């Protein structure tokens, strides 16, 4: 009768749950972290270490967090936690962007615009309350992601101290000579009723009209003479322009040509029966004439654009307005006609070239910019013959103007085209350039552009292409419009002279005095401030500016208002945001940092891509492909979301779908099961009593510690360069290959069958202990909840949190001068694979049921055989096979053969051994098992 030897085996035992059950366990951990003040404890534990400051770019305090928020915050959290483990003190102060239009719009929907139900002060208070509510909602979800930080003391741009520090920061920018004021064309949103910064613009397709308009020459003979041609009597000459913005024609003050472009004087279609010749860029003449219905290109003369400089044309419908031909570098012969209608109030290049020619002094502000902030023509806008423009919105005016031009004969061609056009990022509506009085941070006045380009070169950019991208943006960007004509924001706290419009000569001193008051009472102080308090008798000569600062200035100065204010080093070690922030926060921070201190405010800058579905499509409600982080946490847990983010290539678009989440859940189970197996086999192990020194370990145990050391070197280096996908891949590979397919499988025999305190068993447990200690740290930045859970189950003293620890220092490489090196083990593992290939067909044809039923013969060259023969008694444990014989052969290759064993099977260890039944007390056991149960136990050196 078979005895039950199960009680003599040391099978795995642990209370560490097989199932993560993360949606239930994670909230309980969060409550404990909150109760114990985990962030404060981690900071206190790290006191005195070198600082690593990842400065948080503030999300906007409006609406629930979405998947992009989760990606951003979790990437930051992974870095912060990895820095604690790397021996740094890594403070993380989350922040929120609280001023600006989206919040104003939310309040307007409820209470109407300022002056309807609320005055400006009441309106600002409602904005403040709304933003505070939104912060609380977002903070709850950010914490649920497992992100640690100073959540009780975040920075908020609406805090009085922040607002005051922002005014002080602006004063510093002014002191350094970067502020300017002017009437310039700026991006303008008619729905916002305000200027927009570059970062507030996004491009979308728009269908626009295209028109070719003839500008008749005042003196046709003079134009012809420039081409070396004499005109016949009655022949007209005109310069056609091509535009997609007919609404700007009332503001047309010149036509620009390219000085070095080649132009031709060609025959066009007759105008009211009279011949009309046209001036067109030579490269475009054929295409243009085809649009006008003229088949043949009849050229009468050639000239450079420079030959036509300052010749006069007539406006196509304001006949009394002289339109000079001028020369501009922005003109090309890529498309159109090579002649560009120039409206300085509605284009930056138009403005610059008109300024060079002195055109701005010849016209009134209403002629330069005839539209108001709503996009409607001013009452003073002259009509087009009988067509009234005053009061008409520009988007409706296009067709009206085209019809009027058709009636006058000035319209040569009209069509429509779809093209990429700037839109307001908030309203998703088309915007326009509009010349208005604004405050700017000049890119040239105090060399800001050049200094910023130099500063970019001092920063480490991840990915590296980020450097060229932001440099190109800085190189080509216009002055920064920092003024906004809105209510909810930080005021540009300047006094300007009523007659000259110049800021007070003591402006920055006065701003700092205003900041003291704002720090006590918030921005409302500015609007209630009696100027006489600061200006005394001068008060009657000055007006307070009512414009507020661009919200990108709010967030752009956080290196001063947050880092410096809280005693943290500047520049920060790292800024990390989405790739759209090269034109947003990275850029506004760079410009303010350089404007204030001549240096970039960050040492490293890292960008991540946007989230898309498995087909590469942007996630949206309309497509039904959106996945919210709240849903993932509710169904799978935050650690699964964190694992996906870490495993994705965040430098590009990040794909997510239910199938991808399922794959990550499977990967999580593999990691968790590995941890559970390690813990199960560490049952009864006390590192203080049972730890076997590395040099005394069984060879395979020493090798797995060596492999763990190699992996830790790679993992810590990958964390340092923010390559989290390599970490996840390395972990999964280690769990599947090194541990799952090899080490854990091979060591089961020792762990289960040897005496509890046998050196071979304690050696395996010691190796597993080292691996587990390292493993919990490796996963902690990514799988924060699971690492915390695992930490509590590890043998030995593990109080507090894994983040109190640093990278595990119990690992070491195998000595290069050891009797058997890691290279020797690698050769034996290759032999193990060779054995498996030999056994596979034997299993398939039924010759054996399991590898333990096969006896192996290895034939190798004499030197290799001599090296392996001392191991041959234990090779069966490495191969998990029957007995192994190593023989020398005259060959350079290694040959493996196998045959089914005829030996009896031990019911306890399942090995087939000749010694089974040799002890009458245990007729079904091999001698090894008998010794392990009752005797001194077996010894292992190798496997």
Swiss-Prot record:
Q: In the UniProt record, does the keyword Transit peptide occur?
A: no
Q: Name one GO cellular component term.
A: cytosol
Q: Does the keyword Chloroplast apply?
A: no
| Swiss-Prot/TrEMBL catalytic activity | tRNA(Ile) + L-isoleucine + ATP = L-isoleucyl-tRNA(Ile) + AMP + diphosphate
The residues listed in the UniProt record as binding Zn(2+), with positions renumbered to this chain, are 906, 909, 926, 929
- Where does this protein reside within or beyond the cell? Cytoplasm
Span(s) of short sequence motif 'KMSKS' region = 618-622
One annotated GO molecular function:
isoleucine-tRNA ligase activity
Major localisation: cytoplasm
The record lists ATP as bound by: 621
**Which EC class, in a word?**
ligase
**Disulfide pairs?**
none
Enzyme Commission number, as recorded: 6.1.1.5
Question: Domain description from the entry?
Answer: IleRS has two distinct active sites: one for aminoacylation and one for editing. The misactivated valine is translocated from the active site to the editing site, which sterically excludes the correctly activated isoleucine. The single editing site contains two valyl binding pockets, one specific for each substrate (Val-AMP or Val-tRNA(Ile)).
Q: How does it assemble?
A: Monomer.
- Family assignment? Belongs to the class-I aminoacyl-tRNA synthetase family. IleS type 1 subfamily.
| Name this protein carries in UniProt | Isoleucine--tRNA ligase
Species of origin: Xanthomonas campestris pv. campestris (strain B100)
Per the record, the gene is ileS
């Amino acid at each position: 009768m078979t005895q039950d030897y199960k009680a003599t085996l040391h099978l795995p035992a642990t209370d560490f749950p097989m199932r993560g059950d993360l949606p239930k366990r994670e909230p309980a951990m969060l409550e404990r972290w909150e109760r114990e003040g985990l962030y404060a404890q981690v900071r206190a534990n790290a006191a005195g270490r070198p600082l690593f400051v990842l400065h948080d770019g503030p999300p906007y305090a409006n609406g629930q967090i979405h998947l992009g928020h989760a990606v951003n915050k979790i990437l930051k959290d992974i870095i912060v936690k990895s820095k604690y483990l790397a021996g740094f003190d890594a403070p993380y102060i989350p922040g929120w962007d609280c001023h600006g239009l989206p919040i104003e719009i939310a309040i307007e929907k409820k209470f109407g615009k300022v002056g309807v139900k609320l005055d400006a002060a009441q309106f600002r208070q409602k904005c403040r309350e709304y933003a505070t509510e939104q912060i609380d909602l977002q903070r709850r979800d950010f914490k649920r992601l497992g992100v640690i930080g100073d959540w009780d003391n975040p920075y908020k741009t609406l805090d009085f101290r922040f607002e005051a520090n922002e005014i002080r920061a602006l004063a510093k920018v002014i002191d350094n000579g970067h502020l300017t004021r002017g009437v310039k064309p700026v991006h303008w949103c008619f729905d916002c009723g305000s200027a927009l910064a570059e970062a507030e613009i996004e491009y979308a397709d728009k269908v626009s009209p295209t028109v070719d308009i003839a500008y008749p020459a005042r003196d046709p003979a003079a134009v012809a003479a420039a081409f070396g041609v004499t005109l016949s009597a009655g022949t007209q000459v005109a310069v056609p322009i091509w535009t997609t913005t007919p609404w700007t024609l009332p503001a047309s003050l010149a036509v620009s040509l390219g000085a070095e472009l080649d132009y031709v004087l060609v025959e066009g279609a007759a105008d009211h029966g009279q011949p009309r010749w046209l001036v067109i860029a030579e490269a475009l003449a054929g295409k243009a004439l085809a649009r006008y219905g003229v088949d043949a290109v009849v050229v009468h003369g050639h000239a450079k654009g420079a030959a036509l400089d300052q010749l006069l044309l007539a406006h196509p419908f304001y006949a009394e307005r002289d339109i000079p031909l001028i020369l501009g570098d922005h003109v090309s012969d890529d498309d159109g006609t090579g002649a560009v209608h120039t409206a300085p109030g509605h284009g930056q290049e138009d403005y610059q070239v008109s300024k060079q020619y002195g055109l701005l002094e010849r016209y009134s502000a209403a002629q330069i910019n005839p539209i108001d902030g709503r996009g409607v023509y001013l009452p003073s806008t002259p009509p087009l013959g009988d067509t009234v423009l005053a009061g008409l919105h520009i988007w409706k005016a296009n067709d009206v103007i085209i019809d009027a031009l058709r009636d006058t004969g000035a319209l040569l061609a009209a069509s429509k085209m779809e093209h990429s056009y700037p839109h307001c990022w908030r309203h998703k509506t088309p915007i326009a350039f509009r010349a208005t009085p604004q405050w700017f941070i000049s890119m040239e006045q105090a060399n800001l552009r050049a200094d910023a380009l130099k500063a970019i070169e001092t920063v480490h950019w991840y990915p590296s292409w980020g450097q060229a991208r932001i440099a190109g943006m800085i190189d080509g960007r216009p002055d920064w419009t920092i003024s906004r004509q809105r209510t909810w924001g930080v005021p540009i706290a300047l006094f300007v002279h009523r007659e000259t419009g110049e800021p007070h000569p003591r402006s920055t001193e006065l701003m700092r005095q205003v900041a003291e008051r704002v720090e006590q009472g918030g921005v409302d102080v500015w609007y209630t401030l009696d100027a006489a308090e600061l200006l005394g008798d001068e008060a009657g000569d000055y007006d307070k500016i009512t414009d507020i600062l661009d919200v990108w200035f709010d967030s752009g100065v956080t290196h001063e208002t947050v880092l410096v204010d809280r005693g943290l080093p500047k520049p920060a070690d790292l800024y990390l945001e989405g790739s759209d922030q090269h034109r947003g926060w990275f850029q506004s921070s760079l410009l303010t940092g350089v404007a204030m201190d001549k240096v970039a405010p960050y040492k490293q800058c890292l960008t991540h891509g946007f989230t898309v579905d498995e087909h590469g499509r942007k996630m949206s409600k309309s497509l039904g492909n959106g996945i919210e982080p709240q849903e993932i946490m509710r169904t799978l847990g935050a650690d699964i979301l964190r694992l996906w983010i870490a495993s994705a290539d965040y430098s590009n678009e990040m794909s997510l779908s239910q199938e991808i989440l399922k794959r990550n859940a499977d990967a999580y189970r593999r990691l968790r099961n590995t941890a559970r197996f390690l813990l199960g086999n560490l049952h009864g192990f006390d590192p203080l009593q049972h730890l076997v020194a590395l040099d005394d370990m069984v060879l395979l145990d020493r090798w797995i510690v060596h492999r763990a050391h190699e992996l830790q070197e790679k993992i810590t280096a990958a964390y340092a360069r923010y390559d989290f996908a390599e970490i996840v891949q390395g972990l999964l590979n280690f769990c599947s290959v090194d541990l799952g397919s090899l080490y854990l499988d091979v060591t089961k025999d020792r762990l289960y069958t040897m005496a509890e305190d046998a050196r071979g068993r304690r050696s395996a447990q010691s190796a597993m202990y080292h691996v587990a200690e390292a493993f919990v740290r490796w996963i902690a930045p990514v799988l924060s909840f699971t690492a915390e859970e695992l930490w509590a189950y590890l043998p030995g003293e593990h109080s507090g949190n894994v983040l109190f620890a640093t990278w595990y220092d119990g690992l070491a490489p195998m000595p290069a001068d050891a009797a058997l090196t890691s290279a020797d083990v690698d050769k034996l593992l290759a032999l193990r694979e060779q054995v498996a290939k030999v056994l596979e067909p034997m299993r398939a044809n039924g010759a054996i049921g399991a590898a333990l039923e096969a006896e192996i013969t290895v034939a190798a060259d004499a030197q290799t055989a001599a090296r392996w023969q001392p191991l041959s008694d234990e090779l069966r444990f490495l191969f998990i096979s029957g007995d192994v014989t190593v023989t020398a052969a005259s060959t350079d290759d290694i040959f493996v053969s196998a045959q089914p064993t005829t030996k009896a099977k031990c019911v306890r260890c399942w090995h087939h051994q000749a010694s089974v039944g040799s002890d009458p007390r245990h007729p079904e056991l091999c001698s090894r098992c008998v010794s392990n149960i009752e005797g001194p136990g077996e010894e292992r050196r190798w496997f």
